[in-house]
Curated annotation (Swiss-Prot):
GO biological process, one term: translation
Native organism: Clostridium botulinum (strain Eklund 17B / Type B)
Protein name as annotated: Small ribosomal subunit protein uS7
Listed PROSITE patterns: RIBOSOMAL_S7
Subunit field text: Part of the 30S ribosomal subunit. Contacts proteins S9 and S11.
Underlying gene: rpsG
Domain of life of the native organism: Bacteria
Length: 156
């Protein structure tokens, strides 16, 4: 535990184009080696591709995709009397968002398209249609939680 008390969580500023904090977090997660300009370019180009391919507004598709990827339950290892149990837990809102973004980008990076903006656009479109690797990751997490429902009383 920290000796100097609780550290306040820094708030992110909304992005300049869509005025959304979630988009800013998404851009920050895309960013590598502090190159925010490159990350913004990738994100906004992906959003343009989404608007062209789907015919819907890009932010709408993005929010729908995020809702389809963010997990409601996860399992945490808890050691009780020499045995380790996978205990299902509800996921806090902040962590839901973080996991959703992380899974989305991991799935996008594994895709086969040549450009990163195309990969991100493809994964977001798939996720908005409830398909794709990121949605599968969420379903697997929920299945794990469901399978270990018997240990739910070990919650802490």
């Amino acid at each position: 535990m920290p000796r100097k008390g609780h550290i306040a969580k820094r708030d992110v500023l909304p992005d300049p184009v869509y005025n959304s904090k979630v988009v800013t977090k998404f851009i920050n997660s895309i960013m590598e080696d502090g190159k925010k300009g490159v990350a913004q370019k990738i994100c906004y180009e992906a959003f343009e591709l989404i608007a062209q391919r789907s015919g819907k507004e890009a932010l709408e598709v993005f929010e729908e995709a995020m809702n389809n990827v963010m997990p409601l339950l996860e399992v945490k290892a808890r050691r009780i009397g020499g045995a380790t149990y996978q205990v299902p837990m509800e996921v806090r809102t902040e962590r839901r968002q973080t996991l959703g973004i992380r899974w989305m980008l991991i799935a996008a990076r594994k895709r086969g398209e040549k450009l990163m903006c195309e990969r991100v656009a493809g994964e977001l479109l798939d996720a908005s249609n409830n398909t794709g690797a990121a949605v599968k990751k969420r379903e697997d997490t929920h299945k794990m939680a469901e399978a270990n429902k018997a240990f739910a009383h070990y919650r802490y």
